[in-house]
From Swiss-Prot:
This is NADH-ubiquinone oxidoreductase chain 6. The gene is Mtnd6. It comes from Mus musculus. It catalyses: a ubiquinone + NADH + 5 H(+)(in) = a ubiquinol + NAD(+) + 4 H(+)(out). GO terms for molecular function: NADH dehydrogenase (ubiquinone) activity. GO terms for biological process: aerobic respiration; mitochondrial electron transport, NADH to ubiquinone; mitochondrial respiratory chain complex I assembly; proton motive force-driven mitochondrial ATP synthesis; response to cocaine; response to hydrogen peroxide; response to nicotine. Keywords: Electron transport, Membrane, Mitochondrion, Mitochondrion inner membrane, NAD, Respiratory chain, Translocase, Transmembrane, Transmembrane helix, Transport, Ubiquinone.
Length: 172
């Protein structure tokens, strides 16, 4: 299981590299979609089925809208690719090589570990007398509204501000 999450983390970083080294806006949106999808798989790998599904539906649904919008606004007859400029391709390959080197070093020194989340016991197990029941659907809702409240507020306001930034940029 750790190797699965480790490979997904590496793919997430490669997607972020693709986002940072985008030669055209089309590939930036594609990098965000790939990174978001891999992030959802990581959440599912840790057992957060509801939260992974919510992120997949809401975040990637919104990203597909933004991806379609940027594609429509920045359509080029011959868009640049990662291979059309040797400098961009070199940085992308260098980033992937550095990521593989980091994976090898971490595996050699056995530094890969799972994060210990101590405060999760309050809402994971529902105990009555000596019997404990875990409700899977409610775990995601509890996580979203108890531990991740400020992240949701910041994400909502960021999306709200992003709409106005996009409107201001595309205004004639």
């Amino acid at each position: 299981m750790n190797n699965y999450i480790f490979v997904l983390s590496s793919l997430f970083l490669v997607g972020c590299l693709g986002l940072a080294l985008k030669p055209s806006p089309i590939y930036g949106g594609l990098g965000l979609i790939v990174s978001g999808f891999v992030g959802c798989l990581m959440v599912l790998g840790f057992g957060g089925s509801f939260l992974g599904l919510m992120v997949f539906l809401i975040y990637l649904g919104g990203m597909l809208v933004v991806f379609g919008y940027t594609t429509a606004m920045a359509t080029e007859e011959y868009p640049e690719t990662w291979g059309s400029n040797w400098l961009i391709l070199g940085f992308l390959v260098l980033g992937v090589i550095m990521e593989v080197f980091l994976i090898c070093v971490l595996n050699y020194y056995d530094e890969v570990g799972v994060i210990n989340l101590d405060g999760l016991g309050d809402w994971l197990m529902y105990e009555v007398d000596d019997v404990g029941v875990m409700l899977e659907g409610g775990i995601g809702v509890a996580a979203m509204y108890s531990c991740a409240t400020w992240m949701m507020v910041v994400a909502g306001w960021s999306l709200f501000a992003g709409i106005f930034i996009i409107i201001e940029i595309t205004r004639d």
